[in-house]
Amino acid sequence: MMQRPFRPEEYSLKETSPHLGGGAAGDKLTTTYDLVEQMQYLYVRVVKAKDLPSKDITGSCDPYVEVKLGNYKGTTRHFEKKTNPEWNQVFAFSKERIQSSVVEIIVKDKDFVKDDFIGRVLFDLNEVPKRVPPDSPLAPQWYRLEERNGHKVKGELMLAVWMGTQADEAFPEAWHSDAASIPGDGLASIRSKVYLTPKLWYLRVNVIEAQDLIPNDRTRFPDVYVKAMLGNQALRTRVSPSRTLNPMWNEDLMFVAAEPFEEHLILSVEDRIAPGKDDVLGRTIISLQHVPRRLDHKLLNSQWYNLEKHVIVDGEQKKETKFSSRIHLRICLEGGYHVLDESTHYSSDLRPTAKQLWKHSIGILELGILTAQGLLPMKTKDGRGTTDAYCVAKYGQKWVRTRTIIDSFTPKWNEQYTWEVYDPCTVITIGVFDNCHLNGGEKANGARDTRIGKVRIRLSTLETDRVYTHAYPLIVLTPAGVKKMGEVQLAVRFTCSSLLNMMHLYSQPLLPKMHYVHPLSVMQVDNLRRQATNIVSTRLSRAEPPLRKEIVEYMLDVDSHMWSMRKSKANFFRIMGVLSPLIAVAKWFDQICHWRNPLTTILIHILFVILVLYPELILPTIFLYLFLIGVWYYRWRPRQPPHMDTRLSHAESAHPDELDEEFDTFPTSRPPDIVRMRYDRLRSVAGRIQTVVGDLATQGERLQSLLSWRDPRATALFVTFCFVAAIVLYVTPFRVVVFLAGLYTLRHPRFRHKMPSVPLNFFRRLPARTDSML
């Protein structure tokens, strides 16, 4: 199959010009939603009814209300045997899709065969009032029911009908006409919602010692360790080096705990009898509600806990309390750390857990999620492709989810959200997904919402008080290659409340103080981040509607640490991009030294002489040069936010087998021959890296051998040279030495020869430890 040619313009950022806030005309009724396009809706609030007539033979009434506008029809829930029901439900009809000039509200009596007509109320849309916040809500009124011929009948209906926008308070919970095909139990999964990340703490358990342990086997010295469990997190200490009944460890175990504290900390002291066989010598259970909280690095008081021993009597586990062993612990909840639950490269929040340590916010981030264009079909329904798209945005502890737009490749959300900003060097993440749970959350048979694409925007790359309106490409990487799924249009504004405070932040540490005073190891940070993301995804998946685990993991980049040949190549070329200016300077200096451009070389000679004669000008010259470069580049400063770059990511040039390897499970699920081939390829790459690392080590060892007398003749020569150089440099003015060294470096090619220099020859002859390698 021929691959479609790569076109970079498809994956580029495009500036847009939407009519934000209703445009510049007088139609702009509110400034609350000034980063989205205004959407008009007809709202119908059905509050309650009274004095409804009985229609059944039994003399009862099972009423419900049907709101009808053209081909759209929404119904309330029905009540059994109730003549004065209360519904308090809101219906919203998009003005773009209104096909009638009259809205009809019909009260019906639910029946087994055919629902009976009780009465109706009609409204002419031309007479419906307009209402936009911050106006007060429209007060509902009683309306007398009518027959189809216009005659009044018994019964009244309390209603409120108005024209409004998506800024209306009733909008999030309203029944929407574009979701008319969704059953009642699926409506919860399509509404917009705001979620909060649970408050996360690091739990530090300092296991100090135990006393008076009673082993089951008293003929041997016990090999004792402590096992700690918090929910599904399990850690253990090393085996105590003191094989006694009073072992000591003084070892820290770190966990992640989330408020409200539902799990208990369980510690058990165990004796390792043989591999795979351990005896529990005692256990204690500690509630986190009573654990002290620490805001700095000061030591808290330790505490002794009694160890309970459980024995099995007649098949039942009972507590044995003959003699109590004890364990010495220092436990605290660390409030001075920031619990990392997202990749450190894309952090959206850097504040410590304890709110007392938070600094004041420096600004407001506003995000308008407008529309999407050109979305691809994500699933098949009734024999045709369809997409039910929604967006999720995450910044700090606040997650937002837009409503789901049913069956549309160009969905319009026009929803606006705000966040407080505490640090500009943070990233907001916006993801677009396809909703696969429209038939009710539990009826989807384990379906997973499909990812359509993701956008990241770093706040420090934005100018303050400027509105950025762009169409961002939605790009996903599949085993078949890179694929554009469409575009999402966003409006972003970062407003700074104090420029001085924001500038001051650039001089502050990125993470809270405890990360530097009492740092965690790299392995601890990785393990704790994995536990934190697991807790966050579990908690948010229990919300209603749930923010499902696959969504949270995609937004938090859970699999970013997995091996990828493509990412390795991309990172290598990123390093080369960083080093390329240095390489260019080295090439330029080599051309100067070889007099490729005599005029430039002469000018460099003159500059060099000036700097030797006036060395106090060196640093001012360097900083002035950097200043001029920065001012010169200001004209070509980036005017657009950064976006996903397929060329930088090496996504368009990745080999299919490399992509298949990147999407492989862990552990692998591929056939043995493919795994063997990939292992051999990895060995080949690692072999080249091994050679480069070995060469670097060789050069370093040669430097060390200058004074090690490993080669006595070479060291004697070097020591003699150092003694002579010390005398010469002592009696010779420093400026003369620098001047002569510079002239020698910049000498004309006729005074050069192609053979290596004497110092280089000497250095290459020095011994290294490669001779001792197996």
From Swiss-Prot:
The gene is FTIP7. Disruption phenotype: Male sterility due to defect in anther dehiscence and mature pollen grain release at anthesis. The chain crosses the membrane at residues 575-595, 606-626, 714-734. This is FT-interacting protein 7. InterPro entries: C2_dom, C2_domain_sf, C2B_MCTP_PRT_plant, C2C_MCTP_PRT_plant, C2D_MCTP_PRT_plant, MCTP_C, QUIRKY-like. Coiled coil: none annotated. Expressed in roots, stems, lemma, palea, pistils and ovules. Expressed at low levels in leaves. Its main location: membrane. Belongs to the MCTP family. Its cofactor is Ca(2+). One of its GO terms (biological process) is negative regulation of auxin mediated signaling pathway. Residues 1-17 have a biased composition (Basic and acidic residues). GO terms for molecular function: metal ion binding. Ca(2+) 1 binds at residues 56, 62, 109, 111. It holds the Pfam family PRT_C. CDD domains: C2B_MCTP_PRT_plant, C2C_MCTP_PRT_plant, C2D_MCTP_PRT_plant. It is found in: Cell membrane.
